[in-house]
Amino acid sequence: MRKYTFIGILILMAGLGAACEDQLNALPGQSKVEGNVILDQKTAEVALNGVYYRFADGGDDRGTPSTMWASSHEISPGLLTGYIRYPYGSVAMEENSSLTANDYSVANLWSGSYKIINAANGVIKQIAEVDDNEFVGDRKNEIIAEACWLRAYGHYNLLRYFAQFYDQESKYGVLLRKEFVTSSNIAQSRSSVKASYDCILEDLDFAERYAPDENRNIYVNQWVAKGLKARVLMMRGTEGDYEKVITLTKDIIEKGPYELEENLKDIFKEKGLASKEVMLGIEPFVNQVRHYDDYAYREEPAYLRTTTDTLLYENDPRGEWMRGAIGEGEGITKYLGNQVEVCYAMRLTEMYLLQAEAIVRSGGLLSDAKALLKEVMGHAGITVFTELDAIADRDELLFEIYKETARNLMLEDGIEWSALIRLPMERILEVKPAIREQNYIILPIPADEFEKNPVIGDQNPGYSKN
């Protein structure tokens, strides 16, 4: 079984000729070099696994190898959206407009994305120089495709958090990195929003075409490439994008190897990665406890639910198991159970909800969107749809789709934040008044970036560089 290992082109591996299984289960080395470590398919697989290790935010937790996905992918978006809060005072992400370029969590979101991108660039560059005969069948292109997906994911994260994603004409796009960073090329300006979308979609086109048709659900395949492309096109929302989202998600739902879990709760409490609904998940290391501690540290809630969260789950059966008592407080219990250490990057439920949103936004039949929404809600234990059936207004149905997206996919991969900031500003402020204005649906570029890369360009509007 492959395990996440940070190799890439950054790690000097001891005993490169050892068994592949041993390599993939080894801890990262300490010596970092820019060396040619991809020599054949075997070493390419190890290097690719290093990119997945970065994707999972692998590291060391009190001496135990652990995946630390939750911090940036679950907790930060939950704070930004206003559904959870820190129990001991407050943190800047709870008051969006008070964030600064020196915020630690903002820096983690930024640097984590570039770690994925840089590791992916190393694989893409190195593997291109290896003879095709060193690979079995189409595996060379498949590895490049998986690395392209991971690079696209990193750039997508930066686009949704740090760029004016909603304006194709904006200069406030992503600092795109398509080459492995060295001292000679670290100085680079950020690109436009249009160029950012073009770069991400180019990588996803390659991934969709060449990624494996089948792969364990902790690795990328063609269906996962289609899923991320649907996310990106929904965020862009230009002419024809919603129709493409409908086509992509229909293809995944009707032809892909996934099924909605009969009972949503079973994914988190019993099945984990064994669920056929999980398109892409994060496999934990043996003996790690990091994800449990992210929500129930020392048997007390690490984060509390907010009033907004309480209202969201009012009269919803999920409120009985996704939230609950932890010690003396009302905390987040969604993950607590037999599969507590597993995290989720993409589930089939999201494809249903993206399709429903795209139908409404493209002027399609509200009844079609409602049917998709009912399917998802039914698997979550909802049996009465009187209020949903009564909705006749397109904007109201969009908001209902948003609320189901938040209820179902909250604290997984920032889906609740991405869905919120696609709404009109008045709706955004209804959910999270602390955002105040449009500038604050975007985060500040970390101050450290302006020191390392002074040619990057302007800070995002509403923030200072330090």
Give the ranges of each region predicted by the language model.
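Acidic, glycine-rich segments characteristic of secretory precursors and extracytoplasmic regions
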Residues: 4, 20-71, 453-466
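Inward-facing hydrophobic residues that define packing positions of alpha-helical scaffold repeats
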Residues: 117-120, 197, 204, 242, ...
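Short coil/linker segments at helix-helix boundaries
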Residues: 138, 161-198
